[in-house]
């Protein structure tokens, strides 16, 4: 091994990658000097309300409201009487916690007041804090923005925190926690180290290519590193749609011939009367949507008009809209009447909808289909077997609820395939921004492979590394940061 190559690789590994926000010039420019305060718990009456401060005057705020000459022990709750700093009027008996920086959420001196949650108490304490010199009300997301500015959170971790606050299903919560714990940031840091190593090899060859002591195969080693990284990035980009579906919800469309029980199924899955149920065919004429938590996954569930021909103009428009919605579906629940499988409408649905979808579903990227035979409670035990060849299906009765457990288990499997399973596998890309920067990194690696000059190849690797840097928050523009932090509430 060439005597200087390992040293060069080590030096490059410690070069200003700026993957962590605390090393980023743009993050440093965000570090504020003022002290902020806000109600961090929910609005309205509650047993306990949490009011927090962050900034250099937090200690002054604590002394002003408690008359303490010295702060209490760090990170230990102490019961204190709060008084207005101007009038001395008692406000509340409160638990106070002192978090000296940099060992705090924001990296600054912080105080938390755990007060009784009545509106008058909360209002009184906020007014008292507003009278302390150097304190001002916080803006939306400002506490988290300060944590980012002080390197406590990377940008992907900030997004994970925002997703955790908005999470409505178990799958969303699991994914948000993984991102908040830094799994995506750590993955990007690993990729960046690979790029740094490859760049060190290329730059070593540029600087010492004619040195007899340079180890043979240096460029080949760089090529191997880049090819392995291209495979990893390509795999994550192919799965990017899953992460976005986990964040926004999978499109599940219920379809079938008239009177098969589609609306009953939608009402059963959503556990509320979304659709009108009637024995009259063609009752549903428009697409009805409702957000649902199915098996822990977010879903946009759509009820559609029964598919048939030769009906009035209004219903025909409903059929057209139903077919259009089918094209947008991630998962299709095809519903047939188990007691009427030989009817022309059932046979037509099998031929024109189910068979093409099954052929398409052989492709892993195609739409997914679950065929359901509803009204199984109407089947007689002594009835002759149906001679129609049916694809794999589930028996179901929306009337009695029979078969619902099997349906929910099958839906869980299909939804995990569409949205990804946040309990296993690598972290998902939940934002378009993630996909954009990873694609930019992959494009730069493509330029590296095509480069005819080593200087251009090295610049392509630097550009790839910059894209990873932007993903985790280094060198991010103010506009992008503003867009991300505006999703937070005041006090977070």
Swiss-Prot record:
Cofactor: K(+)
EC number from the UniProt entry: 3.6.1.-
Cofactor note: Forms a homodimer in the presence of potassium.
GO CC term, one of those recorded: transferase complex
Keyword Transmembrane helix in record: no
Residues annotated for 5,10-methylenetetrahydrofolate binding in this entry: 52, 112, 152, 492
Molecular functions (GO terms): GTP binding; GTPase activity; tRNA 5-taurinomethyluridine synthase activity
Segments forming domain TrmE-type G: 249-416
Binding sites annotated in the UniProt record for GTP: 256-263, 282-286, 303-306, 374-377
Enzyme class, UniProt record, top EC level: hydrolase
Reaction equations catalysed: GTP + H2O = GDP + phosphate + H(+)
Function: GTPase component of the GTPBP3-MTO1 complex that catalyzes the 5-taurinomethyluridine (taum(5)U) modification at the 34th wobble position (U34) of mitochondrial tRNAs (mt-tRNAs), which plays a role in mt-tRNA decoding and mitochondrial translation. Taum(5)U formation on mammalian mt-tRNA requires the presence of both GTPBP3-mediated GTPase activity and MTO1 catalytic activity.
This protein's name: 5-taurinomethyluridine-[tRNA] synthase subunit GTPB3, mitochondrial
